[in-house]
Regions:
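Short domain-boundary/entry signatures in modular proteins, especially
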Residues: 102-112, 164-172
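Ankyrin-repeat C-terminal turn/loop position
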Residues: 68-69, 105-106, 130-131, 163-165
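N-terminal secretory signal peptides and thylakoid transit peptides that target proteins
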Residues: 1-17
């Protein structure tokens, strides 16, 4: 089509002809109030998307069908422990949910590739960024554990031979007396949820949570110094050094929060 013909064509063809299928030239939908965070996506939906991607395939399909961009949702569970929807499916080995998310536009990662048994993709990541196999996934879960979760035998063998793909956090043993001295509630403000609760989970592991939020596992570096899961650079220091702790200091880069009981 030459330029003159093209101009004539555009002058007679209505603009509506170029609107994508399924979208009317004059869309008449019931008006709803714009959310406070608009145009950002609903925070509750984002959090739910990541949560259900651990195992609720029906709900995952519902959410991405309504809002495909949620396939790329990410959530910070605390202290910078970021997890994507695909990351959630990957570390629990849920291949069905991973497939749904990827088909909806989720970004593949070395962790999803390891879980799905995509050996050549994992090798390509390692070749492109030597040492990347040492990077931990959400909650501090290792790359090798992702491969194990997906029962990806060939990837497991490769990562074991490559080395560095299963480095755990330090976690020095604490006596029962020492643990007991840390348990309790530490307030960092006057608000009803401005409290950090230190307890043991049903596996006996020491955990911390803000009131109303999920538990975060704690890993002991010695001398009552810990890091929370998924945040190896963050430090939680209990004081004093012995006996019943009265202060919990959280250090996250420039942020320092002191909680007392």
């Amino acid at each position: 089509m030459d330029e003159l013909t093209r101009r004539r064509f555009l002058s007679v063809v209505p603009a509506a002809a170029f609107i994508p299928a399924g979208i009317s030239a004059s869309v008449h939908l019931p008006e709803t109030p714009a959310p406070a965070a608009f145009p950002q996506q609903n925070v509750g939906r984002v959090r739910e998307m990541v949560a259900v991607s651990h195992g609720n395939v029906a709900r995952v399909k519902e959410l991405v069908s309504a809002s495909p961009a949620l396939a790329r949702a990410a959530w910070d569970w605390g202290y910078g422990d970021w997890e994507t929807a695909l990351g959630a499916a990957s570390h629990v080995g849920n291949k069905e949910i991973a497939a749904v998310l990827l088909s909806a536009g989720a970004h593949p990662t070395i962790f999803s590739a390891a879980m799905l048994g995509q050996l050549e993709a994992v090798k390509a990541f390692v070749a492109a960024v030597p040492g990347i196999q040492q990077t931990r996934g959400p909650h501090g879960i290792t790359l090798l554990d992702h491969a194990r979760a997906g029962e990806s035998v060939d990837v497991v063998k490769y990562l074991e031979s490559a080395g560095g793909a299963d480095v755990r956090y330090p976690n020095e043993t604490l006596s029962e007396e020492s643990v007991s001295g840390l348990l309790g509630t530490y307030a960092f403000g006057a608000g009803p949820t401005e409290r950090l609760i230190v307890s043991r989970n049903n596996r006996g592991m020491l955990v911390v949570k803000r009131d109303g939020e999920p538990d975060r596992n704690l890993f002991h570096h010695g001398a009552r110094l810990f890091n929370p899961s998924g945040a190896e650079a963050v430090r939680l220091q209990f004081e004093p050094a012995e006996g019943r702790a009265t202060t919990l200091l959280v250090v996250d880069g420039p942020l320092q929060v002191r909680a007392e009981r």
